[in-house]
Structures are given as structure tokens and as C-alpha cells.
Regions:
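Pyridoxal 5′-phosphate
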Residues: 1-332
Length: 332
């Protein structure tokens, strides 16, 4: 199989990720739920992964790294921490349903900072116009449909100047685009473990630079006499048993990325995307949605066939062993 669907889930994991996940299932119990060696081994792995993620994203305190089920879970925590029913919230025009559906469910007044594709200056201007009076803002770092790298740093500066807390969706950026999460100045940064971080499905991370509200309540293995969730991170948000095998695999994925260098991965992926785009544009039947400015384009690439439905094209490619995704990509 030629696997070209890593924007949904990375399939070809490093062997170290598979080994670490399997080893955790054989040798690790639950962190904070016992003093025996299997529980202590699990606790050490979870903490080490927290430290590794903090180092990768330049987070000064590892406890600000909260493990979640996926990016959707992380975004829901962030949104429910900042948004109340009726609040005006600014979003970009490229957000995933993991942003738009929670906002709709909360009854937020959503303002879309609309801007043309691959025009970062227009995106900044759109946010500048939409921010006054907003209670929160959400912006994806990279569009999961077009691979468009939005000017999140500039948008974050606008939000800070306006006193509007920002949530950054780094689902398509984490592990593929080098960035300093702490320097962004965002309230929260959400990401999955199973895409660019090369971890197993069922893993995610929320980087917390503001005080969050728990989305789930339950056992934390700490401060059990309290009726409410602990105030301290990460326990405040990590109710219930951790996905220890997933976190062990995620740790191996992060270590692989750190050894390779995210900057090197980013350069290689962009070169490959540019080569593919150039080749696709030699075929008159195909339309490739990619920026001419490599600074705006990541390795996520959308293509349309002018005389064939995209679903049918994906089926034909699957017949030849090429895995792609067609449709709205959860971002209509």
C-alpha cells in the first residue's frame, strides 16, 4: 500500500512505537493506583512522556502537559473552559468540526474571520476586524483540508492585545511544523497523538497556559478526600485510568521526532509536497489546491478531478493500493 492518509492518522509508525505500546500492555499497570512495580513503572512512563512533550513544544512546566483521548477531547476541554452560552467567539474559516460543533452545542455566537485561501495577511486583517468584544478565539495552525499554514503567531498577538484568550488547534502541525507553544501566548494548544506525533490512536495532548475547567470528574489517584477535582494540573483534567499503552507509544513517537528533528521533517515534507504539486499540475484534469508560497504550505494537499467525483477517484486509487481520503474531511 502507498499510504497518503497521514493527515487523518499516521499508519506507518516507527518500530519503537509498536514495541513500547506492546511492552506497556505486558508490564505496566495504572499510575497513582498502587505502590507496586507495575504501577510505578506506569507512573514513570507517563511522567517521562509529559516531560518529553514539554521539551518538544518548549513548555516550561511539564505539569501543563495534559493527556487526553485525542485532539477533539482536548479542544472540548479548552472550549468549555473559556466559553459560556451566548458568548461571542471568533474562529477562522478553516476550523474542524471539533471546534465548530462544541461551539454550536454551547450556543456561542460564532464570528467567522473569513479570508481567502493562502492569504495570511488577509487572515490577520479578518481577525483584527472580528475580535472586538469577543470572549474567546479559536484558530487552527494548519488547515486539515488544504495544508494552509495560518499566521497563528500574528493572530495570537492580536488576541493578546485585545485581551481575548486564544485556543490553537495544532492537530496538523504537531510533529510536522516546528513551533514554540509557550511563545505563542495562547491559552490552550490542542493536538492529537496519532498524527504527526506518531503515537497510537486514542492519545492526545492539551497544553494549558490558562486555568481550565474539568470536562470529566472522577478518580485521579491523588487528593481522594476532595469532593471536587483537584486544582492542580495535570490531575485537574486527567480523571480516570490513563491510556498507559498509548502514552508509552506516544513517548516513543516523540523521542523519534526529537532524534530526527521536527525542522528536518518539516523541510523534507515540504519538498515532497512541492514535487507532488508540480507533477499534479501537469495533468489538465486535476486541480491541486496548494500555495505558490512554500511558507504557507505544509504537506497536506487537496486535489480535485475536474470530470470525476472525488469519492470515485479515491475508490479507484484504493484499487491500485493508494490510500487517500475524499469528502469534507470534517471541515465543511
Amino acid at each position: 500500500m502507498i499510504y497518503l492518509d497521514s493527515a487523518a492518522t499516521s499508519l506507518l509508525k516507527p518500530p519503537s512505537v509498536v514495541r513500547a505500546t506492546a511492552m506497556a500492555m505486558r508490564t505496566m499497570a495504572s499510575p497513582g493506583r498502587g505502590g507496586h512495580s507495575a504501577a510505578m513503572r506506569a507512573a514513570d512512563t507517563v511522567f517521562t512522556c509529559r516531560e518529553a512533550a514539554a521539551e518538544l513544544f518548549h513548555v516550561p512546566e511539564p505539569e501543563r502537559v495534559v493527556f487526553t483521548m485525542n485532539a477533539t477531547h482536548a479542544l472540548n476541554i479548552a472550549i468549555h473552559s473559556l466559553v459560556s452560552p451566548g458568548d461571542p467567539v471568533v474562529i477562522s474559516g478553516y476550523e474542524h468540526n471539533s471546534v465548530t460543533r462544541p461551539l454550536h452545542a454551547l450556543g456561542a455566537q460564532v464570528r467567522v474571520a473569513e479570508s481567502s485561501l493562502f492569504e495570511p495577511e488577509a487572515a490577520v486583517s479578518a481577525f483584527r476586524r472580528a475580535l472586538p468584544g469577543a470572549k474567546a478565539a479559536v484558530c487552527t495552525m494548519v488547515s486539515n483540508v488544504f495544508g494552509y499554514l495560518l499566521p497563528v503567531r500574528e493572530i495570537a498577538e492580536l488576541c493578546a492585545a485585545a485581551g481575548v484568550p486564544l485556543i490553537v488547534d495544532a492537530s496538523q502541525a504537531a510533529g510536522c511544523v516546528a513551533f514554540d507553544a509557550a511563545a505563542l501566548g495562547a491559552a490552550f494548544v490542542a493536538m492529537p497523538g496519532h498524527k504527526g506525533l506518531l503515537g497510537p490512536q486514542g492519545t492526545g495532548i492539551l497544553l494549558c497556559f490558562a486555568q481550565p475547567k474539568p470536562l470529566l470528574c472522577g478518580g485521579t489517584g491523588s487528593q481522594s478526600v476532595l469532593q471536587d477535582m483537584p486544582e492542580e494540573l495535570p490531575d485537574r483534567l486527567e480523571a480516570g485510568t490513563h491510556n498507559v499503552p498509548g502514552i508509552a507509544g506516544l513517548l516513543a513517537g516523540i523521542r523519534y521526532l526529537s532524534a530526527q528533528g521536527v525542522e528536518n521533517i518539516e523541510r523534507r515534507e515540504r519538498r515532497l509536497a512541492q514535487r507532488l504539486t508540480a507533477q499534479l499540475r501537469t495533468e489538465p484534469r486535476l486541480e491541486a489546491f496548494a500555495s505558490l508560497d512554500p511558507a504557507c504550505q505544509t504537506a497536506v494537499l487537496s486535489v480535485r478531478c475536474r470530470d470525476m467525483d472525488s469519492e470515485l477517484l479515491a475508490q479507484k486509487l484504493a484499487h491500485y493500493g493508494v490510500a487517500v481520503r475524499a469528502g469534507l474531511h470534517c471541515a465543511p
